[in-house]
């Protein structure tokens, strides 16, 4: 039972993000900021590029939830088709981080286990990062229209009030980056926004269906993780590289964890050699991206109403491009 309940504290963090972003959106507190950005760049798409870039590189746990909350303030309330596109943007904008951040275990573990410097790791992974960034930019460019983005320039909100909303959020993100408890930070932030806005029916901002779904997904992921040792032993005994590729992908798909997928990739690299590192990383990363145990697709589906089929089409093309790129850079 304790195993199944592991990591469920994430739900407290998510509820805090939902309440905070819901109050900001319903009161249009960020309208002056987005309006100012729009005046400067003259394009709603460029505002989305900027917001998704900033929220996507936050070195914090639960980045996809924070990013979703911020992007939600740019989406129309009632246009389901427009809103659904932001679930994809949220996903793409927050998952290139695993390919480059020196603060992320997907970079730290290869550096430690394979005795590589950061630049050496990036010498293997930069083609995958380049493809991912290009794909993200193209998705926003091609799939998102100006009409899909809601920036209301007519709303007149005092700059002082906007400051009292923005600075506590920035401070909270700063505390997250510094390593403080995210559950406590966003619980306090949501209480502050409730009092500031006098929106005491805060529970209406919480997506209870999403909370229930994430609870079940986390339970399933925790149960599967009890078989980690079985998967690891099986992989160690693989002598055929192509079978190792298949099983590595499948196990990463089942486990749905960034720590697990990079562990498998590094283990296979130790067995078969450094020239296959980018390939193993790409395969295990791809398995992780589409894993049913991966909470991020659930967040986008329930937060923005993004259909699973839309995720499937976008992610399938992305992982095909990543794997093809990885195969093409293998040094024979």
Describe these PLM feature segments.
Residues 26-29, 39-43, 73-87, 110-119, ...:
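Juxtamembrane helix-boundary/capping and inter-helix hinge elements in multi-pass membrane proteins
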Residues 6-10, 36-49, 78-86, 162-163, ...:
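Membrane-interfacial loop-to-helix junctions in multi-pass transporters
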Residues 76, 129-138, 188-198, 286-293:
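Alpha-helical transmembrane segments and their membrane-interface exit regions
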Residues 40-70, 238-288:
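Hydrophobic alpha-helical transmembrane segments of multi-pass integral membrane proteins
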Residues 84, 102, 106, 121-134, ...:
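C-terminal transmembrane helix pair
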């Amino acid at each position: 039972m304790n195993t199944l309940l592991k990591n469920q504290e994430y739900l407290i963090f998510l509820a805090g993000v939902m309440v905070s972003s819901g109050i900001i959106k319903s009161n249009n507190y960020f309208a002056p900021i987005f309006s100012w950005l729009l005046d400067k760049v003259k394009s709603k798409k460029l505002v989305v590029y900027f917001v998704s870039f900033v929220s996507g590189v936050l070195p914090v746990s639960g980045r996809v939830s924070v990013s979703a909350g911020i992007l939600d303030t740019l989406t129309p309330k009632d246009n389901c088709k427009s809103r659904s596109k932001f679930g994809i943007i949220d996903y793409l904008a927050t998952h290139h981080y695993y390919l480059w951040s020196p603060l992320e275990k997907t970079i730290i573990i290869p550096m430690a286990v394979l005795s590589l410097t950061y630049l050496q790791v990036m010498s293997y992974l930069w083609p995958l990062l380049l493809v991912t960034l290009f794909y993200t930019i193209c998705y926003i460019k091609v799939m998102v229209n100006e009409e899909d983005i809601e920036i209301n320039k007519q709303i007149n909100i005092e700059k002082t009030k906007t400051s009292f909303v923005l600075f506590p959020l920035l401070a909270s993100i700063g505390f997250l980056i510094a390593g403080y408890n995210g559950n406590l930070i966003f619980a306090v932030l949501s209480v502050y926004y409730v009092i500031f806005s006098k929106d005491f029916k805060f529970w209406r901002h919480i997506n209870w269906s999403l909370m229930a779904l994430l609870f079940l997904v986390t339970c399933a992921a925790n149960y599967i993780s009890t078989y980690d040792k079985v998967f690891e032993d099986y992989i160690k005994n693989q002598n055929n590289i192509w079978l190792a590729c298949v099983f590595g992908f499948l196990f990463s798909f089942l486990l749905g964890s960034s720590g697990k997928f990079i562990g498998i990739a590094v283990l296979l690299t130790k067995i078969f050699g450094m020239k296959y590192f980018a390939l193993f990383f790409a395969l295990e990363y791809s398995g992780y991206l589409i894993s049913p145990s991966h909470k991020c697709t659930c967040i986008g589906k329930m937060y923005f109403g993004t259909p699973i089929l839309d995720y499937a089409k976008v992610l399938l093309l992305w992982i095909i491009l990543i794997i093809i790129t990885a195969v093409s850079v293998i040094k024979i």
